Structure formats: structure tokens, C-alpha cells
Amino acid sequence: MAEKRNIFLVGPMGAGKSTIGRHLAQMLHLEFHDSDQEIEQRTGADIAWVFDVEGEEGFRRREAQVIADLSEKQGIVLATGGGSVQSKDIRNHLSARGIVVYLETTIDKQVARTQRDKRRPLLQVDDPREVLENLAEIRNPLYEEIADVIVKTDDQSAKVVANQIIEKLGF
């Protein structure tokens, strides 16, 4: 890779953005960042606390700032939060500052991968499947809008998906 390009991973909760992102960064010798982890580091609190205290709006404000800051770096792999694409500013930053890879997965896989995870505030409801379906209806077209590459993550290891991304990007 001659120039240090950024790779931004977008997709729904449970698509594997963080896990695949770590593999991808390691394989390409790039720095890895996770926008949710960065928010937690900057606030000194976990995402659930930020949602409880500041609401989703407060969380989204913090997320927009973190992604704006991180996307200015060069040579990174960034795993974004599933809802970050709902911000036009974030979509513009990602599109302008790197390669956007949409990690696509089914609702069934999302449910299976997130069902025991208590760190996902939007899923702490009686019917998380319904929430995931509603979010997919809103967010999937936005992921597709900004994606340079789409890769399905169902039934594949993170390493296999990372290799597919590298192959599709021609690195």
C-alpha cells in the first residue's frame, strides 16, 4: 500500500466491525480505532452510562466528534458505531477521508451475536429483534449509500472476512 489510506468499517451491531477491524489493521500494518472505545476513553465511562445520562442525542454528539477527529488521521482502520451513519456529517467525513467498507449481516446473526451483550443500550428491551429490524430499515440504505465495498460477514471468521476485504480493495 503506497499511500496510507483509511479504511472505515460501517454496518449494524453484531456485524463484526471491531473484531474484523483489529484483524484488518494487523494484516495491513495500520492503526486500529473503535469509535465506541474512543468515546469511553474520552468520557471515562461506558456507552451505557453515556446513554443513561446524556441520552442517545448526547451519545451521537460525542460520536460525531470522535469520528470527525479520528477520520482526520492517516493510515487507520476505524470501526464505527452502527448508528453513526444516521449523521449526514459523519457520512460525508467517512466518504471523503477513506475507503468505506459495509459489513453486511442478517438479523438472525445480529440477534445471535448480541443477545448476551448488556453493553448495547438500544437492545435492552423485550424484543431486540424488532429493534434490529427497525434499525436495519433506517440504516441499511445509508450503509449502502456510502459503501465503496460490501462484504457479507455471516458464517465466516473475522480473519476470512479481513482477507476478503483486502482482496476486494486490491491491497
Swiss-Prot record:
EC number: 2.7.1.71
Subcellular location: Cytoplasm
Entry binding sites for substrate: 36, 60, 82, 139
Keyword annotations from UniProtKB, A to Z: Amino-acid biosynthesis, Aromatic amino acid biosynthesis, ATP-binding, Cytoplasm, Kinase, Magnesium, Metal-binding, Nucleotide-binding, Transferase
UniProt KW GTP-binding keyword: no
Binding locations of ATP: 14-19, 120, 156
InterPro entries on file: P-loop_NTPase, Shikimate/glucono_kinase, Shikimate_kinase/TSH1, Shikimate_kinase_CS
Essential cofactor(s): Mg(2+)
Annotated metabolic or biological route of this protein: Metabolic intermediate biosynthesis; chorismate biosynthesis; chorismate from D-erythrose 4-phosphate and phosphoenolpyruvate: step 5/7
Domain of life: Bacteria
Single GO MF annotation: magnesium ion binding
Enzyme class: transferase
Major site of localization recorded for this protein: cytoplasm
GO process terms (BP): amino acid biosynthetic process; aromatic amino acid family biosynthetic process; chorismate biosynthetic process
An annotated GO cellular component: cytosol
Primary role: Catalyzes the specific phosphorylation of the 3-hydroxyl group of shikimic acid using ATP as a cosubstrate.
Subunit structure: Monomer.
Assigned protein family: Belongs to the shikimate kinase family.
Protein name: Shikimate kinase
Gene label: aroK
